[in-house]
A protein has these predicted regions:
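Long, compositionally biased intrinsically disordered regulatory segments in eukaryotic proteins
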Residues: 1-165
Length: 165
């Protein structure tokens, strides 16, 4: 088997036309339609594409739930729908960062459940996350807050402070 040509032609030696585009461009359109909410590329039926997109979002919700189990448990049966609504037009940042962004978004909207607030407070106390780069462990004592939950990190240990009810 020979290596693919490097001069822009396809395996048959034909240059891509504006109608067909290069293979890489067509693949990019398909990926954008599946994971970034882009329009269906030419030649793809919208219904199967929507089904594949929904399956990928459910898989992504499961990955986030593994990293943020209290957030998912706090939302209960609303978890899949809440995640899909939030993630539909956002790129995949990985389970940890997606969960962090979702928890912060719910906190901003005052829709974060108590379990999710406790988990977010603990993460904010133990890690530094600016929303653009990967979270990093904090080395110094820190406090994380979310709604009524307060977490204190000292010497690598986290204590969750709960108010008396």
């Amino acid at each position: 088997m020979s290596a693919p040509p490097v001069d822009g032609t396809d395996l048959t030696g034909e240059l891509p036309t504006p109608a067909t585009g290069s293979l890489a461009a067509r693949q990019a359109e398909l990926v954008a339609a599946l994971v970034a909410g882009g329009p269906p590329p030419p030649g793809f039926a919208p219904a199967p594409l929507a089904a594949a997109r929904a399956a990928l979002l459910r898989k992504r919700a499961g990955e986030v739930a593994r990293h943020w189990p209290l957030l998912a448990a706090g939302l209960g049966p609303r978890w899949p729908a809440a995640f899909v609504e939030w993630a539909a037009d956002r790129p995949n940042l990985g389970g940890l960062r997606d969960g962090w962004e979702l928890a912060r978004a719910l906190h901003t909207r005052h829709a974060l459940p108590a379990l999710g607030a406790e988990e977010l407070a603990a993460r904010e106390a133990t890690h530094r996350y600016d929303g653009t780069t990967a979270p990093r462990h904090r080395r110094w004592p820190a406090i994380g807050r979310a709604d009524r939950a307060v977490a204190v990190q000292l010497a690598g240990r986290v204590r969750l402070l709960r108010s008396a009810r």
